[in-house]
């Protein structure tokens, strides 16, 4: 029998020897605001929806990453709250054995409407970016 088959997966390590335990997943390239440094009004080309990973593909990828030491997931975008049925994805990912932290980076524009469902699905941490304190 091939010895490589019985070998446990090695943790994800960068060229400096640092072990990585977190995975950032962009669930959409769409955004509902236009920050000049990220989504300028012109020149942004969005991916076809068929090119964006399905929830099943994302779940399969995370399941494959857990044996490599991944235990933390951060969902980003674009604006991840624009992704339809996001709580369903969070629920699937939070239920994967070995995942101990689920986080979301958001501009929070849509958060009020979705917060309860996100929490119920297993989201426990938010990173809210404020790109200005000026309403205009």
Give the predicted meaning of each segment.
Residues 27, 44, 80-82, 100, ...:
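Conserved radical SAM core fold
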Residues 2-102:
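Conserved alpha-helical substructure of the radical SAM core
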Residues 1-2, 134:
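Short intrinsically disordered, low-complexity coil segments enriched in acidic
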Residues 119-121:
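Acidic (Asp/Glu)-rich catalytic clusters
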Residues 116:
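Zn2+-dependent cytidine deaminase-like catalytic core
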């Amino acid at each position: 029998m091939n010895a490589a088959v019985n070998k446990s997966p090695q943790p994800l390590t960068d060229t400096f020897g640092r072990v990585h335990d977190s995975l950032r997943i962009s669930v959409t390239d769409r955004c509902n605001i236009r920050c000049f440094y990220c989504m300028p009004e012109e020149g942004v080309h969005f991916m076809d929806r068929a090119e964006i990973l399905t929830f099943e593909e994302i779940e399969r990828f995370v399941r494959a990453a857990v044996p490599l030491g991944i235990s933390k997931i951060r969902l980003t975008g674009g604006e991840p709250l624009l992704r339809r049925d996001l709580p369903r994805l969070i629920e699937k990912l939070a239920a994967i054995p070995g995942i101990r932290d689920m986080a979301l980076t958001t501009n929070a524009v849509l958060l009020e409407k979705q917060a309860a469902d996100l929490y119920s699905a297993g989201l426990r941490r938010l990173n809210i970016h404020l790109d200005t304190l000026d309403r205009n």
